[in-house]
A protein has these predicted regions:
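Hydrophobic alpha-helical membrane segments, chiefly transmembrane helices and signal peptide h-regions
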Residues: 16-18, 55
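C-terminal motif of bacterial Sec signal peptides marking the signal peptidase cleavage site
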Residues: 20-23
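Sec-dependent N-terminal signal peptides
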Residues: 10-15
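Subset-of-secretome marker
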Residues: 3-9, 25-232
């Protein structure tokens, strides 16, 4: 039985529902905006060197083959790529809250209670840990962002950031989120911290006018420990 089918069956028997909040933002003004291209380039380098972060992810609309509605958790790539947290997953018309662990490439999920099942390769469902991958994740998105334009300033989770719009080639989009199956460039907006080493505060991909994926990062490089579930 495929990992996705196993997850479908497990979710179909669950009755809990939840809603997680993504990063809060507000408008900010004042002073001329920095040039977008150098800012994005510096942020791409910083993001490629990121060792860990807290992630709040939300999906607006419906994206085929992407069951995640909201997700919140901690990611790390030290000593290996891993993640842990909770997600609201939409299946068969119902929203179900599940805790998850991604480690050694496998996805473990607890649909109800604290008993985790191994659903096999995370890449077959959604590999959230890949977001920190320098080659496939947000760093790669930034490195390939074209037509970058600084549009304004916002405050993301208390962090002042420059809002930059642009387009991301299909290859970079599909590396980050294969479920999108992009065939052309996708509009994107990124929010980059104006101070310091220009950490990426938030990114949004908009494959259509009604569908988008938003990823908000915080707690950059804070220690994160991920372990296999007991008995796994």
């Amino acid at each position: 039985m495929s990992p996705m089918r196993r997850l479908l069956i497990a979710l179909a028997t669950a009755t809990t529902a939840a809603a997680l909040l993504a990063g809060c933002s507000s408008k900010d003004t004042g002073g001329p905006l920095p040039e977008a291209a150098p800012l994005v380039k510096e942020s791409a380098t910083t993001t490629a060197n990121l060792k860990s972060a807290h992630l709040a992810l939300s999906v607006t609309g419906q994206i085929k083959n992407l069951p995640v509605k909201t997700l919140e958790g901690d990611l790390t790539n030290q000593p290996t790529t891993a993640a842990k947290g909770s997600a609201t997953i939409t299946m068969l018309g119902s929203d179900v809250d599940a805790k998850f662990i991604v480690i050694d490439g496998d996805l473990y999920a607890a649909i109800t209670g604290d008993d985790y099942d191994n659903f096999g390769s995370a890449a077959n469902i959604y590999d959230v840990a890949a977001i920190l991958s320098p080659d496939k994740g947000l760093a790669n998105l930034l490195a390939n962002l074209t037509d970058a334009k600084a549009e304004g300033r916002d405050t993301i989770n208390g962090q002042k950031a420059v809002r930059v719009t642009g387009n991301v080639p299909a290859d970079a989009v599909n590396a980050l989120a294969p479920q999108l199956k992009a065939t052309a460039s996708t509009p994107a907006t990124v929010w980059i911290s104006e101070d310091g080493d220009h950490q990426l505060a938030q990114a949004q991909l908009s494959p259509s006018s009604t569908n988008s994926i938003q990823m908000t990062l915080s707690n950059w490089n804070a220690p994160v420990t991920v372990e296999k579930p007991a008995g796994a």
